[in-house]
């Protein structure tokens, strides 16, 4: 089974789980995703799969979760989320936790690499902390103006 086909199956699982958890917000995300052509969706899913593989490769090459190379890949993942919805820092944090701790997500990433769920989840947590810090700093600057 191709990785893209695997990703499509996971997307179906995401849809079901998302509607249960987030209701209307999830439904609007699904509507956005379904507005793309099949070719557009395939390209997005292929790019996402490739990004996961690169993260796993970097991990095996000894890169740490906070390395510039890994964080660039997490930034790319963050950008890819916009194909589905606008991800808040909280959503990003929650996704990282879900990838590590929830079996349906963990199983998907383990198929790419058994160590990927923990590494990717930790990398996402680090990225989210950086985003949160930058946001707080921007708010402090605004208050000083």
Give the role of each language-model region.
Residues 1-145:
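Amphipathic alpha-helical "stalk" segments
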